[in-house]
């Protein structure tokens, strides 16, 4: 089956591009000795976990459910971080995770006994806040913004040490401060980490540099990244971890959709699609951003310009304005690009919108549907 034969709406995972990304990441691992983990919050299509596991060291989770998924479907290194863990969650996490990272000293102290009494050795980390913002235009995703709840500042850590925290029981530090950024932002962040926490790094076993590294983007400076990794590895004798999410499946997915109707208002021709920004690609409204669309241009660039929208009742459920060389008609199919990341993991059934099917496309461009969602999937989430 080819992509234009799939029922719409449908997410399509491009296994050829996914493999290209994994080869790039695996190359960084081989050259630097770093361990790279899939951040499941961006991409949790576990059908592909056997493929991903052939190239990466494992996964990182944002809570119990993701950690369970990784344990069941990949079975490699299993890391977890959450701003706060429930006591009953920790009972299971100590059985299935290798690394557990805490957001605060109080969380570590609350769960310390369960970790130390676990049947296996759990590597314990603390998330630090280097108080170094490098983002522009993504404030909602900036963990170093003033008043952030994420990570421990040096001031807070010093206070905890003064009050009796035994750092010798902590194996590593974790920071996650980037979002879709190049390695120059990592270099800047590492300078802040060394300035604020460098004296404490010598006593640790590992440093996790988090995610937000757009390593597989065409213009990403991999050489600088590798220098950063080796600098921290060699200076402090640390094992280095990276946990990208987007970089694993960047440009490795599509969202195939059909034009249901065309309406006009104030001279604007509006395409009503069987997909939705609010339901199927929430980051379009949350960031916001205009997703790439195959065979299209900027508004006015090509002969025919349309506004792309949805069949939900939300007035603001608008994807963006695009232009085309040809006139679009009801029944035509359109294809959004870069739809593997932060799509399937964030979609919802607001307004009773059906969830898109999920398909995989092999290197011969042949597609196979691996999941279909029907009415019962909508109903089972309600009561």
Residue map of PLM features:
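N-terminal capping/small domains of soluble enzymes
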Residues: 1-75, 81-84, 89, 276, ...
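Active-site-proximal beta-alpha core segment in soluble small-molecule metabolic enzymes
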Residues: 34-206, 228-231
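Short acidic, glycine/serine/threonine-rich loops at helix termini
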Residues: 92, 113-114, 134-140, 185, ...
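Feature marks short, surface-exposed loop/turn motifs that line or immediately flank catalytic pockets
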Residues: 132-134, 179, 215, 248, ...
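Charged helix-capping and loop-helix junction motifs
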Residues: 187-192, 221-227, 257, 323
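Charged (often Lys/Glu-rich) extended helix/loop segments that serve as interaction or gating elements
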Residues: 228, 239-383
């Amino acid at each position: 089956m080819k992509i234009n034969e799939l029922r719409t709406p449908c997410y399509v995972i491009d296994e050829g591009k996914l493999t290209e990304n994994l080869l790039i990441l695996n190359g960084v691992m081989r050259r630097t000795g770093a361990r790279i983990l899939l951040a499941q919050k961006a991409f949790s299509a576990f059908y592909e976990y056997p493929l991903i596991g052939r190239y990466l060291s494992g996964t990182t989770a944002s809570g119990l459910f993701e950690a369970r998924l990784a344990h069941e479907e990949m079975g490699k290194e299993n890391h977890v971080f959450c701003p706060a863990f429930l006591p009953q969650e920790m009972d299971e996490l100590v059985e299935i995770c290798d690394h557990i990272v805490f957001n605060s000293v109080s969380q570590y102290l609350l769960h310390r006994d369960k970790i130390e009494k676990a049947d296996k050795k759990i590597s314990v980390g603390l998330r630090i806040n280097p108080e170094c913002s490098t983002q522009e235009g993504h404030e909602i995703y900036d963990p170093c913004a003033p008043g952030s709840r994420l990570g421990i500042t040096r001031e807070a850590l010093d206070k905890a040490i003064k009050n009796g925290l035994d750092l010798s029981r902590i194996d590593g530090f974790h920071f996650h401060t980037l979002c879709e950024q190049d390695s120059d932002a990592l270099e800047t962040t590492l300078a802040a980490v060394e300035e604020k926490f460098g004296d404490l790094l010598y006593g640790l076993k590992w440093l996790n540099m988090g995610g937000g590294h757009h390593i597989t983007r065409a213009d990403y400076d991999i050489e600088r990244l590798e220098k950063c990794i080796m600098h921290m590895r060699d200076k402090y004798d640390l094992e280095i971890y990276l946990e990208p999410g987007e970089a694993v499946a960047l440009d490795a997915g599509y969202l195939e959709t059909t034009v249901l109707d065309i309406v006009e208002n104030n001279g604007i021709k509006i395409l009503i699609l069987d997909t939705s920004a609010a339901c199927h690609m929430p980051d379009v409204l949350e960031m916001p951003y205009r997703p790439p669309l195959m065979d299209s241009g900027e508004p006015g660039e090509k002969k025919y310009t349309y506004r792309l929208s949805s069949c939900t009742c939300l007035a603001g459920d608008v994807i963006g304005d695009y232009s085309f060389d040809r006139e679009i008609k009801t029944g035509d199919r359109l294809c959004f690009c870069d739809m593997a990341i932060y799509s399937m993991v964030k979609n919802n059934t607001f307004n009773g919108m059906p969830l898109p099917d999920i398909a995989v496309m092999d290197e011969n461009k042949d597609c196979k549907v691996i999941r279909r969602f029907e009415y019962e999937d909508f109903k089972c989430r309600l009561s």
